[in-house]
Structure formats: structure tokens, C-alpha cells
Amino acid sequence: MVRAGDTLKRDSLKGDTLKGDTLRQETAMNRRHVLNMAAAMAAGLPFWPVRAFAQPAGPAMTALSAYMSSAARRALPAEADEHAKHHLLDTLASIISGSELGPGQAAQRYIRAHGGQGSATVLGTKLTASPVDAALANGVMAHADETDDSHNASRTHPGAGVVPAALAAADQLGCDGAHFLRAVALGYDVGVRVVLAMGGYEFSYDSSHAAHSIMSVFGGAAAAGSIAKLDPKQMRWMLDYAAQQSSGLVAWRRDKDHIEKAFVFAGMGARDGVTAALLVHSGWNGVDDIFTGDDNFFQAYAPKAQREKLIEKLGERYEVALTDIKKWTVGSPIQAPLDGVDLILRKHPFEAAQVRRVDVHLAPASAAVVDNRDMPDICLQHMVAVMLLDKTASFHAAHDKPRMLDPATLRERAKITLVYDEELTKLLPVRVAIVNIELADGTRLSERVTAVRGTIRNPMSRQEIVDKARDLLVPILGRDKAERLIETVYKIETVADIRTLRPLFQPEH
């Protein structure tokens, strides 16, 4: 097994030598470039710059690709294994519940009209499609709303891109349960690390490129490539094709129906990740190291990237164990404010009619994402109003768009002010919220939330995760099938072929 730490030590020891060699090579290439250009101009011939086409893989890529190739044979530590099962169940529930929402319905219309022929399952439906199209549809359904998991440091939604890609590859190529779970965990590790290398949450906030889609294409490719049993060289080529397809712009913030957002966050990346894996599995080759050398990925997207983060604590730090599961099925920046209102209500119960004013403080970058949005589940003012009225924020309430025009809800919403608090920027990437409530009798109540329920600093229990999944699954699958799916996920290592689970993903009618 290649240890990331050992690789980094070797890199450090060889650093000066590598820099010296690189400088000498660049000097020689520049000298040849000038001489060739002068000769061509003297002869009256056109001149094209000379490029170094064949460039070997660097040490980080070598370690990363070796780790990726061996992941299927390496057992997960007990804690990572448990977390991987939590996130698998949570994402399956997100996909299946998302099948009945607007973006999910849009994905199914596409499959019916244009989806390729194939046997890959479109969850929550009786539809099947090609693995590429199934990954697209399941990815869109996974992020059809704000139910799926999120990784705070990278500002991404790993499960929604990784799990659909893994499912599609497993449907196409076959895979047992233990291998499947390890492939999913690998997807989290690779996709998240690419974004962390690019700058993590700072890249997410400062760039017009969508970190979410970048995570999904690399994470989806890693999971699918593991299921395809690609060797280290093939893994490097696959990452090349993932990079070539990497795209997405934060213009998704202007999306009013969550359809484009679902495509950018998950559907596109899952589709493209599976494509990258299947291209190489079918015999394609590619560039050995897309992360270094001429015109590399980081040069194009994040020139200040820290490549060493690609393999930082790889095999020691499992990103699936550092990913949050949402207690509330709403946009991530709304989680802490809802926790704050919930905590205040538990300590000092009151009715909505007693409230005079509510001030919610968020860091400006977080506030901008959820400020008076058109969709209920990503509109902070609306969801806080719902919490005041209902004393909770259910899945149904978070997706009840007509309620945004309800007079009683609008009356409470008018009491709510979102404060862009620069002081909270200093605490990022931790999303801290301050909720101040003033009652009509002058009583002032306040709560500062620094660790949202479901985050790694305040994790949900297995029972809470099961309860959330059950609430999402039962309306579509029925209680019996939902219970069997939950039970199967927590003993997935006993499943001989993931394809046998298809009936558990589909409604009875």
C-alpha cells in the first residue's frame, strides 16, 4: 500500500532536486524554442511552439492512483465503515424522495424521451437506462432538494454525485456490497480532496467555477473507476477524462426551480464521472498526470492550488466521516438558524403570534445563498417563518411552494431580518448563526449555534439517520420495502451483487 505520508516525505526530500531539474529542463526548452523560432523565421516558414507531449506522472498522482486502484481490496476502518453506511442510506433516501419532486420529474421526462437503452436502475421509478443516463437522472434526483449530505470544508455535496455514479457502474459491471461501499468511500476521498487542493471553501466562494460539480465529477469517477477495477495507470487516465469534463458555473444561484442546481451539483458530475470510468474501461488511454505539466487542470482552474492536499492523510482521514448529514431538509446555511429557533422554542416555548421581531445573523457569503430565494427550501426567511408556525420544519413544509404565498406565513416572514454579519466570516468554514427573538412583551431570547445537529461536531445518531430515511422512503416505497432497504444498507457487506437490490429501489406500482 502506498502511504500518502511516505510519499509526501519523499517529495519533501526530493524537492530541491526536482526544482533544479525542472529549472534546467525549462531553460533548455526555452533555448531550443528560441533557436527553432529563429530558424523558422529565417526560412520564411510558419512556426508553432514546441510542446513536451509525453510527460510522466508526478509523485502525488502516482500515490493517488495507486491508492485508488487498491481501495476495493482495502477494508475500511470501523468508524469509516459506519459513516459510509450512514451516508449511503441518506443518499439513497434523497434520490428516492427526490423522484417525486420537480427536478426528479424533469430527469424522468428526459429518460423517457431521450435516455439510452440499458438496464441501470433509475431509483424511485420502474425506469431503466444506460449507466450514463441513469447516473444523470439519479444525481439530479439526489439533489432535487436540500436533503442530501454536505461537506463543510470543501462546500460540496459529495453523496449526490458519488452514490449515483457508483450505482450506475455497479449496474453495468457488477459489484458486491463490500466493494461497493469502499468505492463510495473512495469517491468522497478523491472528489473532496481535489476541491480542497483547489482552495476548499475559499475557492468555492471566490471563483465562478462550481466546486460542487468539480467534486461530483472526480468523486463520481473515482467510485465508478473502483467498481471497474481500473489499475493505477488507468486511474490516471480516468482522472484526465474527469478533468476534461469538469465544468459548472455558480450561475446556478439564479435557478428558480432547483433543476439546474440539481444538474450542476450532482447529475452532471455523476454522468461525466461514469463516462470517464467507462471510456477507460473500454480501452481508451489519456494523459498520465492531468494535475501537473503543461496546461494542467490546476493551472486552468486554480493556479494557487496545493497539490499535496490530493494525498494529504489519504488512508488515514476518510472524508465520508467528515461529511454532514442534514437534520433539516433545507439549504446548508439555513441549518444553523433553524437549530437556533428550535433550541429557543425548547427552552422558552411561545406562539408565533407572540413574536415581534426575529434577527438572524449569518456570514455574508452564507447569507447571500439563502436570502429571500424563490424556492422554499433555500429561502431563510420563509423557513424561519415556517418554524415559528409549525414548531418544526418538515420535508413537506420545505417543499410546499404554494405556502410561500400563504397570508399567515407571509405575516411571520415580515418579522424576520437576515443580518449580513462580517464578524461571522472570521469563523468560516464553520457556519455560525446567531438568532435573536424579541417577543411582544419585551422578552428577548437569543441562541448562538456553532455546531448544527448532523455536523461532524454534533452528529446524528444511527437512529436519527434511520428515522430521517424512513420518513423519506415510506411514502414512495411503502413501509415494508423501506424497512428492508434500511436493514440491507447496514449489512451491505453480505450482498453478493448490488444489482439484486433493484426491487428495493423501486415502488410497487
Residue ranges: model-predicted function:
Residues 1-30, 55:
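N-terminal secretory signal peptides
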Residues 174, 178-269:
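Glycine-rich, mobile lid/loop segments that gate access to catalytic sites or pores
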Residues 33, 83-84, 157, 161, ...:
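Hydrophobic alpha-helical transmembrane segments of integral membrane proteins
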Residues 149-192:
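Hydrophobic alpha-helical hairpins/lids featuring a short glycine-rich hinge
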Residues 30-155, 254-271, 278-509:
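Terminal-appendage/accessory-domain detector
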Residues 159-167, 216-223, 270-275, 336:
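Well-ordered alpha-helical segments within folded domains of soluble proteins
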Residues 142, 161-163, 168, 244-248, ...:
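Short connector loops/turns at beta-strand edges and beta->alpha or beta->beta junctions
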Residues 97-98, 166-173, 221-228, 276-280, ...:
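Well-ordered alpha-helical scaffold segments within catalytic/enzyme domains
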